Amino acid sequence: MKRPMSTDSLCRPSDIVSPSIVVESELTDFDADQRLLAMSGVSLVIFTSVGCASCRYARQVLPGLPLAIDRLCWIDAGDNGGLVERYQVFHLPALFVVRDGEFFGALHTRLTADALNAALAQALNRTAEELP
């Protein structure tokens, strides 16, 4: 079976499939609570912004890392002020862990597979809380 060709950012033909190893979702003020409560497994919730260089790096790198998660949930901090306030986001990118609709807090770590997986394991050993 032949895969369809696509183009890269310079419009050159490419048959490379996205390197993402996890499901990715975009969440908003309007649907984040409902969707996070309904999702089973581990979700890494990441607040980003268009003008943030570290956020662009996170968007590029995180989908391809071998992380112990089921999905990445992206939230644009500039467009979703209600979530930014409720999650008390003060820096970007900001990472949080949700498992089976329960909140396990923030992650403060480097954006590498080893560091993130260690921080995820530590976070998931905390007592779960309700979503903010």
What do these predicted ranges mean?
Residues 32-64:
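Local sequence-structure signature of Cys/Sec-based thiol-disulfide redox active-site neighborhoods
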Residues 87-96:
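Structural micro-motif
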Residues 35, 85-87:
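Short amphipathic alpha-helix with an adjacent loop that forms part of the alpha/beta core around
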Residues 1-42, 125-132:
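N-terminal leader/targeting and pre-domain segments
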